[in-house]
Amino acid sequence: MAKEKFERSKPHVNIGTIGHVDHGKTTLTAAITKQFGDFKAYDEIDGAPEEKARGITISTAHVEYETDARHYAHVDCPGHADYVKNMITGAAQMDGAILVVNAADGPMPQTREHILLGRQVGIPYMVVFMNKVDQVDDEELLELVEMEIRELLSSYEYPGDDIPIIAGSALAALEGRDPEIGEQKIAELMKAVDDYIPTPARAVDQPFLMPIEDVFSISGRGTVVTGRVERGVINVGDEIEIVGIRDTKKTTCTGVEMFRKLLDRGEAGDNIGALLRGVDREGVERGQVLCKPGSVTPHTKFEAEAYILTKEEGGRHTPFFANYRPQFYFRTTDVTGTVTLPEGTEMVMPGDNLKFGVELIAPIAMEDGLRFAIREGGRTVGAGVVSKIIE
């Protein structure tokens, strides 16, 4: 059977369901696919296969569907730990999320934790589905729960007053009954997602950035750096900066080649070699990035949200304490750094997720939301994301 051609006509957006255990995330996911995609039964989604991202095992279900306006890729995780790992490793990048809250319970501990994580790892937009409304008889109670959700979102710097909240029953939609709280509400939810969660800028439209993987010297031509263009476009003749590890340097790209052919440009997703003017072989190294001047700056101090692997995942067998000094693997290279634990935390156990401070011994081209691995002698022991740059 030939693979169906992927229709590129509609804008593509990545979203996911988040929220407390048993509030109905997977039921909602199934209900959406029933109305807008190839129907996936609850069990198909819930029995998500395990996959490895940065050496960490995560169970994630991927479904896709489309509205009139857009094509969506949607992730749903069976367990709370899977969400934490997913959000921190960025295994499934989300442009926005549907926060599912049981109307009868209101916000619960994991509701709060997922909102906080969303804020820390840079999920820019959320839409709320208040589920299981058929279990609440009292209209006033629904209003109270809605108020509580809005306040909670605002306390984590989401615009709680503006976020669309749709109240309905995912199960009713899935079972095809009570359309006024079922099907109609799923349609209303997807309309809100269409309207409220903006289409992200495509990678080629963002400022140019390429992590340097290798450096070669070509006699008579100069220095070539190779890597995969992460975003943006580079044209021959563009002025660019080399950022990270050493002082930032300006240079000009005098050539772009791919598969040994000369091109006039390279764009997001391309593996290229870029010829740099006036830079010698010793003047540039793996771990630095090429970027549009002024778009990214080098930093050594930041706050991070991290997940520490369990022994079973191949991580540490013992806890670590203040002043722990592992390597932080950013893009293509390891840099040693010192960890500062938050007030009141004495030690960190394998399997924990937490926020901590890091100071690197050399600067790295860094932005909020940049992912990294925590390593000890080449072995991955954790994963993290830069939540706030300090200096």
From Swiss-Prot:
GTP hydrolase that promotes the GTP-dependent binding of aminoacyl-tRNA to the A-site of ribosomes during protein biosynthesis. It catalyses: GTP + H2O = GDP + phosphate + H(+). One of its GO terms (cellular component) is cytoplasm. Monomer. Residues 55-59 are annotated as: G2. Mg(2+) binds at residue 26. The keyword Transmembrane does not apply. Belongs to the TRAFAC class translation factor GTPase superfamily. Classic translation factor GTPase family. EF-Tu/EF-1A subfamily. It is found in: Cytoplasm. Residues 131-134 are annotated as: G4. Pfam families: GTP_EFTU, GTP_EFTU_D2, GTP_EFTU_D3. Residues 10-201 form the tr-type G domain. Keywords: Cytoplasm, Elongation factor, GTP-binding, Hydrolase, Magnesium, Metal-binding, Nucleotide-binding, Protein biosynthesis. Residues 169-171 are annotated as: G5. It is an enzyme of class 3 (hydrolase). GTP binds at residues 19-26, 76-80, 131-134. Its EC number is 3.6.5.3. This is Elongation factor Tu. Residues 76-79 are annotated as: G3. GO terms for molecular function: GTP binding; GTPase activity; guanosine tetraphosphate binding; translation elongation factor activity. Residues 19-26 are annotated as: G1.
